[in-house]
């Protein structure tokens, strides 16, 4: 066990990662060494930042806590703290079932952890972070919470109503990250498109993107987690006309069948969804659309699922993720619907949907062979440099594997010609 060392383990989404990075900065300001690697845990203090969104994520968080509890009992770590969405949602149950944890913190009161250790919370460092990502990109959280009332979703239960961060504060944070060498910014929130409605009484995302785009040194801005209902169409010309705003939009649609959209309480119709997607592709030529879909929601019939498959084949999303419905306590669906679709049926539908998407992804990637793209290099591996185009977000999208004919520097941009493609990877060579 290393004295004055803190290990922080982050589970779940990139929004959690930002919270962990801010906590790490506070520990550093108080003289601690911090590490963010689950394979090197030996600190005097270990903090687990949990996810509580759906059953699988909850199970992963609990298993991690139990594993660390065993390490604590063996004397390999000192104090064990838990924070984040799981403990925000199930605090009393966790306190009862996991006595090996020294204290639980929620999603918003984790700042108390510092003072509970007898240390000082530095308010002037509130938005400063220790980056756990490669130094050339960072996630920037522009809001917290959600005002939507989707039937299946526990996020509003955990995080409460939407709270937009002040625009000036976000701009200052980006300037500070640019000064540290960050070039690429993933703008994130549970619902990007709601940004500003609470604080400024208007949809302010287009203005925010313009202001961040104007900052010298910002090479790429990528937008994650838009909501399709009442989409701010003023964003599209910003995306089209500004070179450093990636032609990329991550917008979770969940389904296309009108009966399912109504049961899910999505406040959008099939026709409106098609209109949105067609307008995005028309107004931003070359845009890559990423979406998330759900199968197995209560009430989903075979006809609904077949309609979803036809939709995916028709739209041909460049990027797509999917998951099976999870019956989450406290949600509208939990209170009003029966979780009647067998788990094996959910899994079969999910597997089939992803096989369809794999074929589409293979076609999308194959169409890029022979084209040249501006690529940022993320890292060097044994046989390749690994990079991404503007159409690829870290962790979730395809990467381009670049031959080692020429020495390259991670964090730098290069013109790369695609010479081969697979379903989830491209292969390329740097042009001199």
Curated annotation (Swiss-Prot):
Keywords: 4Fe-4S, Cytoplasm, Iron, Iron-sulfur, Metal-binding, S-adenosyl-L-methionine, Transferase
Binding site for [4Fe-4S] cluster 1: 13, 51, 85
CC cofactor: [4Fe-4S] cluster
CDD domains: Radical_SAM
Molecular function in Gene Ontology: 4 iron, 4 sulfur cluster binding; aspartic acid methylthiotransferase activity; metal ion binding; protein methylthiotransferase activity
Catalyzed reactions: L-aspartate(89)-[ribosomal protein uS12]-hydrogen + (sulfur carrier)-SH + AH2 + 2 S-adenosyl-L-methionine = 3-methylsulfanyl-L-aspartate(89)-[ribosomal protein uS12]-hydrogen + (sulfur carrier)-H + 5'-deoxyadenosine + L-methionine + A + S-adenosyl-L-homocysteine + 2 H(+)
Entry's Gene Ontology cellular component terms: cytosol
Binding annotation for [4Fe-4S] cluster 2: 146, 150, 153
Alphabetized Pfam families for the sequence: Radical_SAM (PF04055), TRAM_2 (PF18693), UPF0004 (PF00919)
Compartment(s) where it occurs, according to its Swiss-Prot or TrEMBL record: Cytoplasm
Keyword Metal-binding: yes
EC numbers: 2.8.4.4
Every TRAM domain range: 366-432
Domain Radical SAM core: 132-363
Gene Ontology annotations of biological process type: tRNA modification
InterPro entries: Elp3/MiaA/NifB-like_rSAM, Methylthiotransferase, Methylthiotransferase_CS, Methylthiotransferase_N, Methylthiotransferase_N_sf, NA-bd_OB-fold, Ribosomal_uS12_MeSTrfase_RimO, rSAM
Function: Catalyzes the methylthiolation of an aspartic acid residue of ribosomal protein uS12.
Protein family: Belongs to the methylthiotransferase family. RimO subfamily.
Official protein name in the record: Ribosomal protein uS12 methylthiotransferase RimO
Organism field: Parabacteroides distasonis (strain ATCC 8503 / DSM 20701 / CIP 104284 / JCM 5825 / NCTC 11152)
Gene: rimO
